């Protein structure tokens, strides 16, 4: 069961598609968000969640104070789950009289990134299916530059794959392993 861990929508249960996604575990999400909060990154953030799955990363950010979250998901069933979860979190935030802008984009990441950016995002989550290659992630990161302004980029990968060679314009700030998962912290 995936849930919002903390913030104004904390403890709300999110829906998940049957097998189309691999949601980030609560333990890893809590670690990611503790670090983001300690760096004062979340409050008022403009968040982009690529390969969104259930939308849990973006919606956790919304619960903790992000002003805007866009979730990009190619799979139609998973995108529908993102929409349902967005409604759950938006309703909870509305009860608290918090204004929040959320959007689900049902496109492939490469198609989304090929369109001109209308927003400068300052917090990006990239948690692709493990079968996505490092070359594809590097291509995504190259295209993503047009959408970023003083951004923190969090990339989740299988610990069984080599670390990507980060493209120009990105600095690897840190990496941390959690069993089968490794989280990379980039600044752009």
Regions found by a protein language model. Name each.
Residues 1-188:
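Class I S-adenosyl-L-methionine-dependent methyltransferase catalytic core
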